[in-house]
Amino acid sequence: MKWKKSLTGLSSYKPGKREEEVMAELGLTEITKLSSNENPLGTSPKVAAMQANSCVETEIYPDGWASSLRKEVAAFYQLEEEELIFTAGVDELIELLTRVLLDNTTNTVMATPTFVQYRQNALIEGAEVKEIPLLADGEHNLEGMLDAIDEKTTIVWICNPNNPTGNYIELADIQAFLDKVPSDVLVVLDEAYIEYVTPQPEKHEKLIRTYKNVIITRTFSKIYGLASARVGYGIADKEIINQLNIVRPPFNTTSIGQKLAIEAIKDQAFIEACRTSNANGIKQYEAFAKRFEQVKLYPANGNFVLIDLGIEAGTIFSYLEKNGYITRSGAALGFPTAVRITIGKEEENSAVIALLEKLL
């Protein structure tokens, strides 16, 4: 086959092991998955009720415009419906963005380490990837990113809060950055974890009215607990949305996914409960880190913590796995002596912390 040359050296995404697989390998009867930043509280009771009672005509294609969901999200953020695009998770939106803006004559600027799909999709399109190392505390080096922009740059990526460090960039700093970015360079503000920031920041959505070169990406996979439904969305100026719709598959979000997302966004009381539970979980890990000088906890603003224990990441990962907890090794994320742990329920956090204390 005459594969694209840009695929040379790339590999497919490797998801973590399934719980059943780990239990069989290690002879465990119970295991807790804290590796994929899923919501430990599940999803809204309203979503559960819709799921139980929903009758979806599986032989009929879904609404390709996601009309009802579009109306709900537009009303929630006080946006125009044409300022939204819905995709099969943010992953698909990232793919669409690289497809319309990147090729082998362009480059893209991003932090490192950050969400791996920016780099992967850019390389598939043949673009040059300019990676700017994070600062020592895990913050984006915004000045370094600005310096990397040149006449061939078409996309700049900012994951906020950043995955895997959890650092959050304040709105004023984002605006100061955007003021310096050329107007023909698209800035992607990936806010998959924004709902977890405590206290909730000033709304970012209206940035698109001031900066026509910005798209904000959001998801129903994290705090809304709809990871398997695969519903993500972008907020941007109509011109950006129109260009993305040219390459968007016609029926890319499912009927059931659209219905569940509508119920999910209606139940903000559940979202607030999740945010509070998550904030309390972060405090548990902060208290743990203060007890040990050798432990570095990166600023946590998502639903996960990145903890550097000064011990080889694979050792930490295997130790926790053998004791019934699947986490994410920092070795694959650019942090060779750290692990990323999804914030769980209070008792799950306590159990993991107790294990880490024994390891230290």
Curated annotation (Swiss-Prot):
List of residues that carry N6-(pyridoxal phosphate)lysine: 222
Pathway given in the UniProt record: Amino-acid biosynthesis; L-histidine biosynthesis; L-histidine from 5-phospho-alpha-D-ribose 1-diphosphate: step 7/9
Cofactor: pyridoxal 5'-phosphate
Keyword set includes Secreted: no
SUPFAM superfamilies per UniProt: PLP-dependent transferases
Molecular function GO terms recorded: histidinol-phosphate transaminase activity; pyridoxal phosphate binding
Catalytic activity as recorded in UniProt: L-histidinol phosphate + 2-oxoglutarate = 3-(imidazol-4-yl)-2-oxopropyl phosphate + L-glutamate
Biological process (GO), any one: L-histidine biosynthetic process
EC id: 2.6.1.9
Family matches, as CDD domains: AAT_like
Top-rank EC class of the record's enzyme: transferase
Pfam families linked: Aminotran_1_2
Keywords: Amino-acid biosynthesis, Aminotransferase, Histidine biosynthesis, Pyridoxal phosphate, Transferase
Database matches in NCBIfam families: hisC
Quaternary structure, from the entry: Homodimer.
Protein family (similarity comment): Belongs to the class-II pyridoxal-phosphate-dependent aminotransferase family. Histidinol-phosphate aminotransferase subfamily.
Protein name: Histidinol-phosphate aminotransferase
